[in-house]
């Protein structure tokens, strides 16, 4: 693990630093009559640049010129117990539209919102030390999410949702970067080479 002396403070860098597979351990507190929840899942993040066809497609939904966007990322939520193909029912495309005068601030255009399954517009802002705040107003609720890197292998994420009827929900997540298949194979080959060159 490496401490991040210069955490990402633009969405482009944040997406790139988040690239890959993450194990999410989350706890959800329902501040009404429902029981709390705890679960694990996987999250796959794949950033893309402004030339990706998704940029124009999603920007058109919001009436925003694609030239204002700076790429984005695809997200997939998966079970961490079953080997599954990626399911678009548990996926989202997020487009980054930074403010030209303030690259640490901007808008996120989502083809599908996290809370309400419809296109969603969010605002975002980074603090100088890399804490990302995302605010999203839906038709029937308002969400705030904060996310930051503890180091290059661990992310923290907290969020809250306030509904019109007053009921609220809070979520706390610790996210661990998972090694890729190539990483595992490389480590295995290194161990094999070490064992061959350093016999007992």
Swiss-Prot record:
Superkingdom field: Bacteria
Catalytic activity, EC: 4.-.-.-
Database matches in InterPro entries: Calycin (IPR012674), CpcS/CpeS (IPR018536)
Entry keyword set: Lyase
KW Cell membrane (keyword) present: no
Group of enzyme by EC: lyase
Keyword Transcription regulation found: no
GO terms for MF: lyase activity
Pfam families assigned to the protein according to its UniProt record, in alphabetical order: CpeS
Job of this protein: Covalently attaches a chromophore to Cys residue(s) of phycobiliproteins.
Family: Belongs to the CpcS/CpeS biliprotein lyase family.
Protein name: Chromophore lyase CpcS/CpeS
Source species of the chain: Synechococcus sp. (strain WH8020)
